Amino acid sequence: MNKPLHSPRVLCLLFLVLLPAQGRTAEAAPPAEAKKLPFEDEIKRYEEADKKSPPPKGAVLFVGSSSIRMWRSVAADMAPLPAVNRGFGGSKASDVLNFIDRIVTPYEPGSIVYYEGDNDLQSGRKPEQIRDDVKTFVEKVRAALPQVKIYVLSVKPSPSRARLWPSAQETNKLLRELAKETKGVAYIDVAGEMLKDGQARSELFLKDNLHMNAEGYAIWTRIVKAALTGNEPEKAKQ
């Protein structure tokens, strides 16, 4: 006489047969991949370049968005000061925070020139949020490198983002105040000479009316180099 399939003995045998298969299925499941950070590929390229040719310690580190990344002549412009460019285009102030321990502190720079804000405002972030991210950047960097000087550049005007200029001005006001009250930080106004009658000077920009041309970078070179060599009106606090 056939035993019913639902008898205790049959059910027990089925359980013993299926249990190893379930274990194999669980073991074969791939681990969940960590979420990839924005700009991870750009940062990895810098890290690979550093392995082949490590930047000098004590150099001036330029970090920030495309206004830094596209400053391809910065090493020549800052000479004889050694300069390292680690800009990554499209970045916001919050993005730089993700990579402090990879493209900032490992270089042990003597000073840092920092530029963000353009893309933050374009994405809808508020001046106070930018100021807070810059403050966090300063705190994290100086916790690792207490002697480093940090020069925060003003948010620049541009014809393509003229509507954001009032917010940029408010951001610059907050950044200036942050520098005044923070040890080892200086604010550098690169925006003033880029204006004429309150509007961005179009002759300083590429056809996209956002990124600067050589004439625009010539202004930045003169102002930033003066600050780095101690000839600026607002010096970093010792």
Which residue stretches match the model-derived regions?
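Generic structural signal for well-ordered alpha-helices
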Residues: 100, 134-139, 172, 176
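Catalytic His-Asp segment of secreted/periplasmic serine-dependent ester chemistry enzymes
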Residues: 13, 159-238
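A short helix->loop->beta-strand "cap" motif at the edges of active sites that frequently abuts
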Residues: 145-149
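Conserved beta-strand scaffold positions in the cores of enzyme catalytic domains, especially
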Residues: 62, 83-85, 187
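Oxyanion-hole/transition-state-stabilizing segment in secreted/luminal serine hydrolases
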Residues: 68-84, 93-131, 135, 151, ...
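N-terminal cationic-hydrophobic initiation segments that often serve targeting/anchoring roles
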Residues: 104, 138, 142, 179-180
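N-terminal secretory targeting modules
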Residues: 1-62, 72, 76-77, 143, ...
